[in-house]
Amino acid sequence: MAKMYYDSDCNLKLLEGKTVAVIGYGSQGHAHAQNLKDSGVNVIVGLTPSSARRKQVEADGLKAYDTAEAAKMADIIMILVPDEKQAAMYEESIAQNLEAGNILMFAHGFNINFKQIVPPADVDVIMVAPKGPGHTVRSQYKEGRGVPALIAVEKDASGKAKEYALAYASGIGAGRAGILETTFREETETDLFGEQAVLCGGVTELMKAGFETLVAAGYQPEIAYFECIHEMKLIVDLINQGGFGEMRYSISDTAEYGDYVTGKRIITDETRKEMKKVLKEIQDGKFAANWIIENKAAGRANFISMRRNESEHQLETVGAELRKMMSWLKK
């Protein structure tokens, strides 16, 4: 079982007298920066010269600098730009501005685990990864609560890397909920597997296959969408709130019986074998290599083509029309 840490295990005073540069001001960046600021930490924000987020940073009471300048000013650098942009940004703006004793931080292990970023030996390399979207990290903090987070230490040059990870996690509010210790490798491999086999790849293909099966059998696309796609949120919310037991308690006995007798016909031994292959391709770096090549290709043509093809599926058109009926979805 994972070991849990809380605010009582963290020493936020370790961050006193240090400057934290949060690189990026998107979903996670704005939450980290504002939470740290409200925790009394000296925070600056690093952005590209052309970033449109500078005004928002200033409106939030923070100071924005070009990424290279922010990195040079900082003792702790948290990189919160998309994975595919991190390596180039690191080489162009951060690497030459690192000093011995600095702390380099990430919220996902991809670029360290797959050696797209190789920091010098005299800096700490740490992960602090909240297990929730940035707006939740921020809103929970403001309400006096927090979102659980993972911490990991890849390189402990200072001898205090774990303590710094805990301090930072506490500063963004994670210590109020719970902090779990992991490794860069474990976080990276499980995160990628969960996305590909279950949360994104697995779920979308399952919903799409169900929709297509009903439509091919002559059922109305709108009914197929309701039964195979729209109602997914109802089930996931129940599981999120109380696990499979809560979900099964809340659904009809007919649905529960169908769960038991049919689920294993859909997720078969062959499916599990394929899942193991997917995991192996993540572990041995095959997936990462393919994704890195894709991002280096001009225009990311294959990726854009797949995105376009999926956007043209019938379920997208049907769903868009049905969502017009749902007043609670309208902002």
Swiss-Prot record:
It is an enzyme of class 1 (oxidoreductase). The active site is at residue 108. Pfam families: KARI_C (PF01450), KARI_N (PF07991). Mg(2+) 2 binds at residues 191, 227, 231. Residues 183-329 form the KARI C-terminal knotted domain. Its EC number is 1.1.1.86. The keyword Metal-binding applies. Pathway: Amino-acid biosynthesis; L-isoleucine biosynthesis; L-isoleucine from 2-oxobutanoate: step 2/4; Amino-acid biosynthesis; L-valine biosynthesis; L-valine from pyruvate: step 2/4. The keyword Cytoplasm does not apply. Belongs to the ketol-acid reductoisomerase family. This is Ketol-acid reductoisomerase (NADP(+)). The gene is ilvC.
